[in-house]
Amino acid sequence: RKEYEVYRAHDGQEAIEKFEGCRPDMILMDIKMPVMDGLEATRRIRLKGGTLPIIALTANAYDSDRDKAFEAGCDDYMAKPIMAPALREMIEKYFGE
């Protein structure tokens, strides 16, 4: 069983602040958040030089939503609800754990 250190952000602006302060290895970015949505937060993290994997999380599983996530700079996409085995598989995809 793997253990991970998790930082939470309640909105897109806070996600950017956490990225700058904590320098995580991966971001699971909810698309619908108050203050600033996850797509805009992803764009700004990429503009700041963030190259880490950013995985879009959304309740909308439409192709157009997936395309918007990739255009914003997300590396991958998961539709909610997120199941633990699928999340582990996603982490392993990027870190080979």
Residue ranges and their predicted role:
Residues R1-Y7:
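Two-component/phosphorelay signaling modules centered on CheY-like receiver
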Residues R8-E17, G38:
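Helix N-cap/capping motif at the beta->alpha junctions
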Residues E20-C22, R44-L52, A72:
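Conserved phosphotransfer cores of two-component systems
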Residues C22-L28:
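Active-site beta3 strand of CheY-like receiver
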Residues M33:
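Receiver (REC) domain active-site loop signature in two-component systems and cognate sites
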Residues I82-I91:
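C-terminal output helix
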